A protein has these predicted regions:
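One-carbon transfer enzymes
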Residues: 1-212
């Protein structure tokens, strides 16, 4: 059984998909042992508590304190959050990490210590529309502006780059001529739920095979 930590910044609908799959499948190869958030108001933390899953808040303010957080650079905050997240994963003995709507770019030792054991969900068909600044609504706006005929989501391994790791799962949807960022998001969200579960299952089975 693979113990996973799920990192979430928002409402946690993809986290809920992972929770629901685990609870409804006795043969599920993963167990969510921890939910980590970099936002104190993330509803994902409530979802975790309702499911009896341990939570850790690793926002820059929580980690550094108000004064230091406000004075820190973007890279300093990213490293502080990443290091706190790594400590949380070690504390709860997480074998792997699933980024399910996580906004802070991870950096530092966590990338090396969990190499090949971190996957991320991205709301576009990588390698298109990835990299710095490409998250949430920004991605959907860019897809529509580029007049793409299709979009979707990608689950990929995390490396030291931004949205550059090897791809595990992709799900496609059509982009309609009258789409807005909101309508496109609504069409992609259900396939994100499918993709994140598929990605977690693939990760769990691969790591189990490697151990065997």
């Amino acid at each position: 059984m693979l113990s996973i930590a799920v990192f979430v910044s928002g409402s946690g609908t993809n986290l809920q998909a992972l929770i629901d799959y685990e609870k409804s499948h006795t043969s599920c190869p993963y167990r969510i042992s921890l939910v980590v958030s970099d936002r104190k108001d993330a509803y994902a933390l409530e979802r975790a508590k309702k499911a009896g899953i341990a939570t850790e808040l690793v926002s820059a303010y929580a980690v550094l304190g108000k004064e230091k957080a406000e004075a820190a650079s973007r890279d300093e905050k990213r490293l502080a959050v990443s290091n706190a997240a790594l400590a949380a994963c070690k504390k709860h003995k997480a074998d792997a990490i699933v980024l399910a709507g996580w906004l802070t770019v991870l950096c530092g030792p966590i990338i090396g210590e969990y190499r090949g054991k971190i996957i991320n969900l991205h709301p576009a068909l990588l390698p298109k529309f990835g990299g710095e600044g490409m998250w949430g609504r920004h991605v959907h706006e860019a897809v529509i502006a580029a007049r793409e005929k299709e979009s979707g989501c990608t689950v990929h391994f995390v490396d030291s780059g931004c949205d550059t790791g090897a791809i595990l799962v992709q799900k496609k949807v059509s982009v309609m001529p009258d789409d807005t960022p909101e309508t496109l998001y609504d069409r992609i969200a259900p396939v994100e739920h499918e993709a994140i579960v598929e990605g977690a299952l693939i990760l769990a089975r691969r790591l189990h095979e490697n151990e065997g």
